[in-house]
Amino acid sequence: MSVALSGELQGAIYAALTADAALVALVGSEIYDAPLPSGGALPLGEHVTLGEEEVKPFDTITSSGGIHNFDVVVHSTANGFGAAKDVAAAVGAVLIGANLALVGGHLVSLRFLKAKAKRGVAPELRRIEMRFRAVVEDI
């Protein structure tokens, strides 16, 4: 089943990001796997959210799994891109090639696909959308 490990993969990604000292030094505890409450103020500085995910089957004759393309988004209230890019680099350092443990499956690979830096309007002045690909195999 191609989406069977989606929740477990998201949990492992979140755990890896929140456990990384370099990333936490940049954003503190401002790492979210759910949308921020509507109407609430954005955290000042930078924060990270887990974004959208698209899953496609990755099945062979002997096994089944999924290709998970997912976004991690860096948000910033700063005027320039510098701080947001530092956070994006830290996110990449955590995830690219990571060996995340999955109880119900095996992470075959985790790689970076692309990033897009955008200017926004106050209060979110900068945003970097990072896309990653995880290939997982059910066990």
Regions found by a protein language model. Name each.
Residues M1-T60, A98-V103:
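Small/polar-rich, solvent-exposed N-terminal microdomains that initiate assembly or binding
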Residues E52-P57, A78, K114-R119:
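Short, well-ordered turn and helix-capping elements at secondary-structure junctions
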Residues P57-T60, A78-N79, E137-I139:
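Short, cysteine-centered beta-strand-loop-beta hairpins and adjacent loop/turn segments enriched
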Residues D59-G65, G120-L125:
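Short, solvent-exposed beta-strand/turn "edge" segments of beta-rich domains on protein surfaces
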Residues S64-A78, R126-V136:
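Oligomerization/assembly interface segments of phage tail-like spikes and tubes
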Residues D71-G97:
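Mid-chain, well-packed structural core segment of small domains
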Residues A93-I139:
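Acidic-leaning, charged glycine-interspersed low-complexity segments
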